[in-house]
């Protein structure tokens, strides 16, 4: 299964590199493939959050930081589809790329921490986080290439540094709580990434707004 996913990521990148050399494939088709990958990201992050919820200490719910504490919260993004439709395609792609870039380091930390997470489903969680890491990198690299077709605005990336350090804590409750919080933040952002890419796909296909 892992080998198949890795091969899929390599194929996704190979197609985009080919398109960078020759514009043989319509942008709408490339965005369709990107939105399929973002859908996988969001589904996987949702499953991971549910796995963590199944064994989350009551105290953890009390001390979990608010969503506004997520390191990407400072990025101003559309709150719904109607707002997203008002944003230019280049700016929307820039938002997606900024969110993906912001999660490269935190996902590495989550992947490392998952290896020793005090949770009954630790092995499954560790495998899924590694898949998230690979999918996120593949999608980000692909959109980096695709951004060249949308102009300078799409190539701009907002800096959203993660300042949580390289360790999510030592004691059991804090470790589970911090891991859960980071995963919840990623799930929220993966929903934005998926939604924005679907809007971009819709607009590239020149569908009516009500069809998006």
Swiss-Prot record:
GO BP field: positive regulation of cell population proliferation; positive regulation of receptor signaling pathway via JAK-STAT; response to nutrient levels
Query: May I have one GO cellular component term?
Result: extracellular space
Signal peptide location: 1-24
GO terms for MF: hormone activity
State its location(s): Secreted
Q: What UniProt keywords apply to this chain's record, in alphabetical order?
A: Disulfide bond, Hormone, Secreted, Signal
- The answer to whether UniProt assigns keyword Signal to this entry is yes
Q: In which tissues is it expressed?
A: Pituitary gland.
Identify the Pfam families for this entry. Answer: Hormone_1
Annotated disulfide bonds = 70-185, 202-212
State the family it belongs to. Belongs to the somatotropin/prolactin family.
Task: Kindly provide the name given to this protein in its UniProt entry.
Answer: Prolactin
What organism is recorded for this protein? Dicentrarchus labrax
Name of the gene encoding the protein in the UniProt record: prl
């Amino acid at each position: 299964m892992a080998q198949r996913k890795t091969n899929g990521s390599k194929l996704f990148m190979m197609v985009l590199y080919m398109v960078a050399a020759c514009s043989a494939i319509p942008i709408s088709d490339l965005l369709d493939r990107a939105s399929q990958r973002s859908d996988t990201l969001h589904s996987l992050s949702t499953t991971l959050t549910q796995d963590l919820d199944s064994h989350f200490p009551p105290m953890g719910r009390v001390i979990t930081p608010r969503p506004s504490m997520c390191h990407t919260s400072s990025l101003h993004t559309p709150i719904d589809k109607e707002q997203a439709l008002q944003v230019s395609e280049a700016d929307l792609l820039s938002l997606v790329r900024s969110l993906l870039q912001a999660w490269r380091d935190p996902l590495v930390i989550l992947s490392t921490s998952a290896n020793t997470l005090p949770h009954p489903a630790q092995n499954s969680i560790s495998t899924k986080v590694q898949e998230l890491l690979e999918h996120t990198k593949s999608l980000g690299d692909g959109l980096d290439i695709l951004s060249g077709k949308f102009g300078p605005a799409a190539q701009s990336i907002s800096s959203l540094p993660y300042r949580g350090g390289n360790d999510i804590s030592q004691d059991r409750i804090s470790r589970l709580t911090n891991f859960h919080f980071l995963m919840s933040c990623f799930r929220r952002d993966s929903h934005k990434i998926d939604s924005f890419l679907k809007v971009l796909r819709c607009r590239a296909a020149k569908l009516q707004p009500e069809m998006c």
